Design a protein with these regions (language model features):
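A "functional boundary" signal
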Residues: 5-13, 17-165
Length: 165
């Protein structure tokens, strides 16, 4: 009898954890859909996710990257450096997640630009471009090339800027 109760209790806890993880994953899918048309709604969905439900590193990294993306698209001037570190800590070790790795590099480069570090930003943009060639997301690629061109234009290197525009 005790064994049966223990098994039932353990299975309930495990099942509840899986349900919570699925709920968060479904919220992430909704956020990705809302990013293009309503980034402020995506931000609200992300803020409604309790921190306890982001159990593993992969979920925390995905949350961080989605939050950064939503803040950028909603044109909020939030300091997202700590979230960038969370995302980078995970994605630099997982090359199979190349698209998220490139997006993290892109946002890290923008953070460097905001700090006034153009050479550091350019290095990160070019690293993202190097890895981005195998991807077929036209929006991300276009934003990356536009940013690289802007940095070169700011340095008065119009020949290289023209190549990226």
């Amino acid at each position: 009898m005790k064994r049966c109760i223990c098994v039932l209790l353990v299975s309930t806890v495990l099942f509840g954890g899986c349900m919570n993880r699925n709920r968060v994953a479904n919220t992430f899918v909704q956020v990705e859909k809302a990013l293009a048309v309503a980034p402020d709604s995506a931000m609200r969905l992300l803020k409604d996710i309790p921190a306890k439900s982001l159990g593993n590193q992969a979920m925390r990294a995905r949350y961080a990257l989605l939050y950064i993306d939503a803040a950028e698209r909603a044109q909020l001037n939030e300091n997202t450096d700590s979230l960038l570190r969370i995302a980078w800590r995970y994605y630099r070790k997982h090359p199979q997640e190349m698209q998220n790795r490139c997006r993290t590099l892109y946002y890290m480069a923008h953070s460097k630009l905001r700090q006034g570090d153009k050479p550091g930003a350019l290095r990160l943009f070019l690293e993202a471009e190097e890895n981005n060639d195998s991807l077929d997301n036209p929006r991300d690629r276009g934003m990356l090339y536009l940013s690289i061109g802007d940095v070169y234009r700011g340095e008065l290197n119009f020949v290289r800027a023209y190549r990226y525009y």
